[in-house]
């Protein structure tokens, strides 16, 4: 199903849906630090050059046009992120829903989008 969805939307560039399966935010940060350390070790990066952009370029989401999601939707009724997108979620709008992922329907997505649209985004202000 995901392969068909990916193929059907391969030329679509306006919005992106990311589904994280077996993802760990701490592992992502460890992997990013290792990549940066390797660059320092091989001389392609100086410690003084480490900045926000360098860190973001080593995260799992670095291939996306926008690595920070506008909205994060958490199903299952849990009101926490559990380390999900630890770096990227800083300015994301968080939507928590009581429904479990397998029962998630189009109407649930529409409700989440409507909730998101009603919010006033301050982006850290």
Segments (PLM) and residue ranges:
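Flexible, compositionally biased loop and terminal segments
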Residues: 1-125
């Amino acid at each position: 199903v995901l392969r068909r969805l990916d193929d059907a939307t391969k030329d679509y560039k306006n919005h992106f849906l990311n589904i994280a399966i077996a993802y760990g935010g701490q592992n992502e940060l460890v992997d990013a630090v290792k990549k940066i350390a390797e660059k320092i070790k091989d001389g392609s990066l100086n410690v003084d050059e480490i900045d926000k952009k360098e860190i973001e370029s080593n995260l799992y989401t670095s291939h996306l046009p926008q690595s920070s999601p506008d909205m994060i939707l958490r199903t299952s009724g849990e009101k926490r992120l559990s380390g999900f997108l630890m770096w990227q979620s800083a300015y994301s709008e968080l939507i928590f829903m009581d429904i479990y992922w397998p029962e998630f329907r189009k109407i649930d997505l529409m409700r989440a989008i409507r909730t998101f649209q009603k919010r006033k985004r301050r982006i850290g202000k």
